Each structure stands twice: as structure tokens, then as C-alpha cells.
Amino acid sequence: MTEQYHRWHSPNLNLDLEMLVFGDRGFPVILFPTTKGRYHQNKDFGLIDCVKWFVDEGLVKIYCPDTIDDLSWYNKGIHPADRARNYSWYDKMLVEELAPWAMHETGVNKVAVAGCSFGGYHAANFAFKHPEMVSHLFTMGGAFDIKMFTDGFYNDDIFYNNPVDFLPGSNKPELWQMNIILGTSEHDMCKDYNIRMSNILNEKNMNHWLDIRPFAKHDWPIWKEMFPHYLSTIK
């Protein structure tokens, strides 16, 4: 399995970002880390190894970028407005830098996005905000309501980065063309977030699969079962 390391200066964030890329061809998949995880986390915890076959067969090319959790939602040392503004710049980086990069390299005009736990938030927020750029959304143990990080403060930056708030009123036609899988499990602490998101999608008649696995907890073993299954749905 080929692996490449990239470091670049993001003009949208005005800081350096790092990323690992696995594979040399195939459908582009942007895979986000969990809470405060770095670009190498999904490799370190075995999530990349569990989909090695898809990479080796040239079916997918997986992009594992850094996030800015410490500069945005998890930074209690700055005002919630600053947390939200920083995250809006991160979203702009995805739109203007990373997603076009992945599409250009693979020759595909959309990306798949995925993530476990808080990585599921990153994936869902990007997919639902920019469905014109996303064909597949795979979340595993995701949570989708960012208001728990805003100390009661609320503004437009929070609204437009909170899927449970902006999605009900969005009518972008590409939303109904997306392949959406919400993966959770019986003992997942984020199960209720997934049920709530599924209800929102049902109210909008958006086709999706709410995959609730029995017995499992909010942890890597069940996510490593889910991820190859979900990648197999990419056509």
C-alpha cells in the first residue's frame, strides 16, 4: 500500500497542515481523525489497514488530513465566536484546497467523506454544507450537534457549521443524490445523535442507512468492521 506524506501552508488558515495519503488511484475519500487526533491517527489505530484491499486494488485513494480542533471547538481559552470563525476557515480550506486537490489527483468530480466519532462531525458538516462536492458520507459513531461546545453563544458561523440546524432548511438538490450511511452501535454514547440525524433525513425524504450494530461500544473495533463495509458501497 503506497503512502505519501504532505505538508503545505494553507492560505485560508495561515498555518501549516499535514496529511497522509494512501493509494495512487481510485475514488477519493477524505477521512477525518477523531477528537484532537492528528493526520496519522487513523493509520495508528488500524483503520487504514482494515481497508488495505480497497487501496491496493485501486478502488479508493484515502486522504487523512489534520483538523484544527485545538483552535476551534475544543479551545476553551477563546470566545465561542472565535472558535466558530476558526472552524469556518477550516471549512473554507476543505472547499478551496483539499477537496479540489483530491478531485484533481484522482480525476473524479466529487469526493467521499468519512470519520469516526468527532471525525464524523467533520465529515457530515462538510457533506451537508457542500453536497455538490460530495457523493458519499460515511460516519462511524458520529455526533452532529456542535452547540455543546459554544457555551450558550450562537451566531451564523455556528448555525452554518451545525448540521442539525442548517440541514432541515437546505434544499440543495445534490443532497438527495448522496449515499449516506450513519454508523452507530447499541452501546455507542453517540447513538442518540445518529437517531436524531436519521430522523432529520427521514423528514426530508433523504435516502440513507442508519446502521445500528448490536452489542458494540463507541470504539475502534466496531469502526474497523464498519469502514470496509461502507467503502464497498462506492460504485
Predicted region positions:
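Non-catalytic cap/lid and distal C-terminal segments of serine-dependent acyl enzymes
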Residues: M1-K235
